[in-house]
Amino acid sequence: MLHKEKQGLYRQVRYWVEDESRFGLHTVERKKITIKGIQPLGIHQYKYDYLWLYGLVEPISGQSFFWEWSHLNSECFEIFLELFSQKYPEDLHIIQLDNGRFHYTKDLQIPDNIIFIFQPAYTPEVNPIERLWRYLKDYLKWYVFENLDLLRITLRNILNKLTKTVVSSITCYPFIVDALCVANI
């Protein structure tokens, strides 16, 4: 079915950005204020256990959808899309995403109410959700987690405190607003 034909079948058309990010037990280092010439002190942990957070954000409204997985592959991505599609079944979703190999495998089943727009290769800066990952990791800076369960709890608390206003202020680039206005979305 053509995209134009799909549009008439749904209540509204929504624009989302998607990406995945790895969160783990390795210490997230960020700048600290110190006296000039003094190296900042912090406890470093070099454990390499991690989890993947898959995320979708609607920059205009600040609405978001996150799901945690233990790994990054097309099977997890397909289930993630299905869960998202079931949450908003009456809307047509245009999703901007990067060119990760698992985003376009032959066997990938994309729900009918989702259309992909692939961003140019090697341009994470055009995907607004990258700024949200940075924002989340800034909350985790210099934390040392004993295990993944403690990291999960902290991450869930941070995500639960995110308001739509904050998400929109981080991810709503002016060029996106302009493009959506021109496209009448």
Annotate the PLM regions.
Residues 11-15, 130-185:
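C-terminal anion-handling pockets and recognition modules
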Residues 39-46, 112-131:
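RNase H-like polynucleotidyl transferase catalytic core
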Residues 24-26, 103-105, 126-128:
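Short catalytic/ligand-binding loop motif for oxyanion handling, primarily in non-cytosolic enzymes
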Residues 1-74, 78, 82, 177-181:
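Extended, low-complexity cationic-aromatic segments
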Residues 12-13, 90-92:
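A general structural motif
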Residues 105-113:
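Short, aromatic/basic amphipathic alpha-helical patches
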Residues 19, 91-103, 127:
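Acidic/histidine-rich, metal-coordinating catalytic segments
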Residues 23, 122-126, 150:
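A short acidic, often aromatic-flanked loop/helix-cap motif at beta-alpha or helix-coil junctions
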